[in-house]
Amino acid sequence: GKCYWLKVYEIPEGTKNSKGRAIQNLLNIDSDDAVNAYLRVKSLSDQEYINSHYVLFCTKNGVIKKTLLEQYSRPRQNGVNAITIREDDRVIEVRMTNGNNEIIIANRNGRAIRFHEAAVRVMGRTATGVRGITLDNDGQDEVVGMICIKDLETESVMVVSEQGYGKRSEIEDYRKTNRGGKGVKTMNITEKTGKLVTIKSVTDENDLMIINKSGITIRLKVADVRIMGRATQGVRLINLEKRNDQIGSVCKVTTESLEDEVPTEEVE
């Protein structure tokens, strides 16, 4: 639940195959701690900017918190407390908003809730937050991601499961409710699909990078993934050739930023 600062030019540039450096070499964090989320911020000295944007936190157990960006505008080497985390919880997503975004939170069991960020009051840095989504009481459910929708006309919802299945759905398929509910089905979770691993807001101009736990990476065009109903199973996005392999990470990138970097794979 702590926040640290780092200038992008201080990060050593590497290739796509390089190992990278331990984050402890760049930030003054404990050796047993880990980075769970990061934000790219345009400026921390522009008063108008930092007083008109918010940092939105979401935790594994469904807690959400909104704090004015200004609260994080004074860098300290040892970091500052960004959110008070309850026992057995952790931050899984952090987004920056302008105060007028639609929020969608998804859980591992394939449900998602949509509400306006105005439903989350502004709190101080050390606050715990409020209930964003109610999880299933099965001991295994948890939040897998949170997205902030800025443009309802061009953005859609992309979800990906453990076994490499995924799909896009229209935002309007998710009815707007009050925060704290259980939400609606965002993917039909089966033994074949595995549990949900991520949710992303995407446009036709985006590419998707999918990395499985065995280290294989593919890139695919979001426009090649057809729009489907939110309660459907989706289509296979990546073939997992090794037994017990699963999707490890998914990220959204602009198409032009990856030209000639990673081979594109067709979607079944």
What are the functions of these language-model segments?
Residues 2-268:
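C-terminal interaction appendages of subunits in large macromolecular complexes
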